[in-house]
Amino acid sequence: GYAPSIASPANGKFVADFEAANKAAPDLYGADSYGVLFFYKAAVEKAGSTDTDKVRTAMRGLQWNTPQGTKTMRAGDHQAMQDMYAMRVNGGKFEVVGQVKADAAIGADVCSRF
């Protein structure tokens, strides 16, 4: 989930920039789209190339910062992991009322195919 009130290093800047550009608060889709751009950027930097195979390899196990906090792309099953948030809606605004750490929010990586 996502809420503009999530306390992460990247979120404050993201919210301010998004609101200035769009005259509206960001939602999950805006936050995820923003975060995935930095995933690709981090993978290209790690690969030292934009070559598809090199970037794909660099994505395995990669960590990057997003408005929702740090995300990790698991190497085995390519599952993106992040902390998950429980929300309450008050007056049309999302309020974070709980948080589950990424490693507790998803099952173990048992994939050995990749």
Show where each model-derived region lies.
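Extracytosolic ligand-binding ectodomains
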Residues: 1-114
